[in-house]
Amino acid sequence: MPTINQLIKKGRKSAAVKTKSPALQSCPQKRGVCTSVKTITPKKPNSALRKVARIRLSNGIEVTAYIPGIGHNLQEHSVVLVRGGRVKDLPGVRYHIIRGTKDALGVEDRKRGRSKYGAKRPKA
């Protein structure tokens, strides 16, 4: 426990805030190339085959990113844009692929929440 004089001289050191997406290096998004595309199973109590891709970012860091939406066209060597945002039931997946940019096409026949999946407005 410090004395009053020690606190006056030095002061308290505030804890450094730890980033949740360190591979992006304070950028909103990063470009990357898919090295592999696969499915993984979520942790209990959920059950599914979640689509993920292993991506080498433009800064050389390799991350695992989730592919949102139903169906995708990604394969090895696809160029994608990656944003932060974890998937709660997939351990180690802390990034999302942005649909509708670069080689990742938007979700087909999406009517609601289109902007999150890169879907164009349907014809009336």
Curated annotation (Swiss-Prot):
Answer yes or no on keyword Ribonucleoprotein.
Answer: yes
Give the molecular function GO annotations: rRNA binding; structural constituent of ribosome; tRNA binding
The region called Disordered is annotated at 104-124
The 3-methylthioaspartic acid modification is found at 89
Which keywords does UniProt give here?
Answer: Methylation, Ribonucleoprotein, Ribosomal protein, RNA-binding, rRNA-binding, tRNA-binding
Q: A Pfam family name for this chain? A: Ribosom_S12_S23
Which stretches does UniProt call biased (Basic residues)?
112-124
Q: Mind telling me which InterPro entries this protein's record contains? A: NA-bd_OB-fold (IPR012340), Ribosomal_uS12 (IPR006032), Ribosomal_uS12_bac (IPR005679)
- GO process terms (BP): translation
Q: Which domain of life is it from?
A: Bacteria
* Gene Ontology cellular component list: small ribosomal subunit
Record function comment:
With S4 and S5 plays an important role in translational accuracy.
Describe its assembly. Answer: Part of the 30S ribosomal subunit. Contacts proteins S8 and S17. May interact with IF1 in the 30S initiation complex.
Family named by the database record: Belongs to the universal ribosomal protein uS12 family.
| Name of the protein in its database record | Small ribosomal subunit protein uS12
**Gene this protein is translated from:** rpsL
